[in-house]
């Protein structure tokens, strides 16, 4: 198996831990940054990506029967990255909430493909091993990205959203999957 394919699949596994992560270290600051916001608005920032991820995981699974998996993956990655950009540019609470919904959509398209690509490219014991590595990468990313977003939140509340640019790496690697 070419290393570029492994790196591509592993990079997608890393993304499973990221949705909603950047908001966590700044939740306590949101009522100060946006004093007109309700507690419900602030809670939506952390819960909306997960709420929308669920139906889009189901939709993505169904779409893989009719649409090229790599195209679907790249669409999800683009939505994910655009979410990061829009978060960085947001100046109003309603914008952050709308972007949270967009992030959930992008994430939902990607999540089933991380394990789906393992099923597609690996068999037997090697497939089982890749599932284990995928899980480990997801958890390592969760810990690392949590530390990074916490550090960045101390500098500026917009900076934790930089983690939503990580899918650019996965997008570049996904280009190698097109020809296989």
Model-derived regions: residue spans:
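Helix-loop-helix hairpin linking two adjacent transmembrane segments in secondary transporters
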Residues: 133-176
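Residue-level signature of mid-helix packing/kink "hotspots" within the transmembrane helices
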Residues: 21, 50-58, 142-143
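Cytoplasmic helix-loop-helix junction between adjacent transmembrane helices
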Residues: 101-136
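Conserved small/polar residues in nucleotide/adenosyl-binding loops
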Residues: 178-180
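Helix-breaking motifs and short loop linkers at transmembrane-helix boundaries and internal kinks
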Residues: 36, 68, 89-94, 123
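Conserved MFS/SLC helix-loop-helix module at the cytosolic interface between two early adjacent transmembrane helices
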Residues: 55-91
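Extracytoplasmic
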Residues: 5-36
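Paired small-residue
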Residues: 83, 94-102
């Amino acid at each position: 198996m070419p290393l570029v394919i492994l790196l591509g699949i592993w990079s997608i596994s890393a993304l499973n831990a990221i949705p909603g992560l950047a908001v966590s270290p700044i939740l306590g600051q949101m009522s100060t940054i946006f004093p007109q916001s309700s507690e419900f608005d602030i809670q939506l920032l952390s819960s909306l990506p997960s709420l929308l991820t669920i139906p889009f995981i189901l939709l993505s699974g169904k779409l893989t029967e009719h649409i090229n998996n790599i195209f679907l993956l790249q669409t999800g990655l683009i939505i994910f990255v655009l979410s990061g950009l829009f978060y960085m540019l947001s100046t109003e609470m309603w914008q952050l909430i709308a972007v949270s919904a967009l992030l959930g959509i992008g994430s939902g398209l990607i999540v089933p493909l991380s394990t789906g690509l393992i099923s597609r490219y690996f068999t037997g014991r090697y497939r089982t091993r890749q599932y284990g590595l995928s899980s480990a990468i997801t958890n390592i990313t969760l810990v690392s990205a949590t530390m990074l977003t916490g550090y960045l939140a101390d500098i500026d509340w917009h900076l934790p959203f930089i983690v939503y640019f990580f899918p650019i790496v996965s997008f570049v690697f996904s280009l190698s999957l097109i020809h296989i």
